[in-house]
Amino acid sequence: SLARAEGFTDSQIVRAIWYTEGGQKAHYAYGIRSVRYRDIAEARRICYNTVRNNRRRYAQYGHKQYPDYLSFLASRYCPTTGKLSRAEKKLNRNWLKNLKYFLMKGEIKCK
C-alpha cells in the first residue's frame, strides 16, 4: 500500500530519520535545514510531511527512476548531487545505508 514502503510505515521512517540525523545530539532536528522550525515537534511534522509527500511523488513518477521508495526519498531528503560541497556529498552517501540500519534496528526491537 501507499502507506508502507518496503514494509515500513511513515512513522517508522520518521523515527529512523531522527536517529540517522543524530537524534538528540543533532544540530538540526531530523536534518531539517531548508526551513525554520520552532521546536523538535515542528521539525518532526516537517519530516513526516516530507516522507508522506515523497511517497506520493514516488508512486506518481519516482518509481520510473528509482528501484524503491527509500532510494527515492534519499535522493530528495539527503541528495548526493547538486550544489553540495565535497564533504556534504561524502557524508550524504551514507544516509540511505544508515536509514535502513535504523529501520531494521527498530523492527527488531518491536518484535
Regions found by a protein language model. Give the residues of each.
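Acidic/histidine-rich, surface-exposed loop or edge segments in extracytoplasmic proteins
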Residues: 27-32
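Short, functionally critical alpha-helical segments immediately adjacent to catalytic or ligand/cofactor-binding
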Residues: 8-25
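Non-catalytic cell-wall polysaccharide-engagement segments
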Residues: 5-6, 34-111
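Short acidic-hydrophobic catalytic motif
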Residues: 1
